[in-house]
A protein has these predicted regions:
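N-terminal amphipathic alpha-helix/helix-capping segment at the start of soluble metabolic enzymes
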Residues: 1-22, 167, 171
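Conserved anion-binding
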Residues: 2-5, 73-79, 84-158, 162-166, ...
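Metabolite-binding pocket within alpha/beta catalytic cores that recognizes anionic/polar moieties
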Residues: 35-89
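Short, acidic/polar
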Residues: 15-27, 72-81, 140-150, 193-201
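A C-terminal functional module that forms or caps the active site or interfaces directly
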Residues: 42, 46, 161-201
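Conserved, mostly hydrophobic/aromatic
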Residues: 10, 36, 66, 90, ...
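Catalytic domains of carbohydrate-active enzymes, especially glycoside hydrolases
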Residues: 26-38
């Protein structure tokens, strides 16, 4: 979530087409700049890809696929999205490394010139305890800073990190977009999220 002319994305985290249609109907005429984030759950559903491809051009569409594989495979995966000309953002994992991120950026330029590649850093479902269980010895903040710096060198368009790390990377990623997931209203259930913020805290 960001201020002024930037976009507030509504997370369409369901495989239900009727629920997605309801979400869009309720928000499409908002005075705010609203975009829609679609993850693997809806993208891989029966109507997902077809529905996304038919969304009006004025809708800001974020395809949150979090790609991570060898550079060639990620590149091919992005080329396979060439029919989705209305997608504005696509996520890949920063932990895939420099070569993978550069390959993704090159593939995006050939597939859809307006497609921006976002580097996902540490998922908001991780706590300091659970990130160490994966073999990391650094704090989440240090990992995010390191990954954001790498994404900048790879010339990606933006960073996805929790609001808790956003301030720390603003000075590093000056012209890159920073998108903060894990936004909850006061009193909402956190679900499987660990590092969350309210909208006012995120702003």
């Amino acid at each position: 979530m960001t201020r002024k002319n930037n976009t507030i994305f509504v997370a369409c985290d369901t495989s239900s087409l009727s629920k997605i249609k309801k979400i869009i109907k309720l928000t499409k005429n908002s005075s705010l700049n609203i975009g829609y984030k679609f993850g693997l759950e809806f993208f891989n559903s029966k109507h997902g890809r077809s529905f996304i491809s038919k969304l009006p051009k004025q809708h800001m569409v974020w395809l949150d696929l979090k790609l991570k594989d060898i550079p060639n495979t990620v590149s091919s995966s992005i080329h396979s999205l060439k029919d989705l000309t209305n997608v504005h953002y696509l996520t890949i994992h920063a932990s895939g490394g420099m070569e993978m991120m550069q390959a993704a950026k090159r593939a995006a330029a050939k597939t859809n010139k307006k497609l921006k590649i976002l580097a996902v850093t540490v998922l908001t479902s991780f706590s300091e305890k659970s990130i160490k269980q994966t073999g990391h010895t650094k704090t989440i903040k240090k990992i995010v800073i390191q990954q954001a710096s790498l994404a900048k060198k790879a010339k990606l368009d933006g960073i996805v990190c929790s609001g808790h790390e956003a301030k720390s990377i603003k000075t590093i990623c000056k012209k890159m977009q920073i998108i903060t997931p894990g936004i909850r209203l006061e009193g909402d259930s956190k679900g499987d999220q660990q590092r969350v913020m309210t909208p006012s805290q995120a702003f």
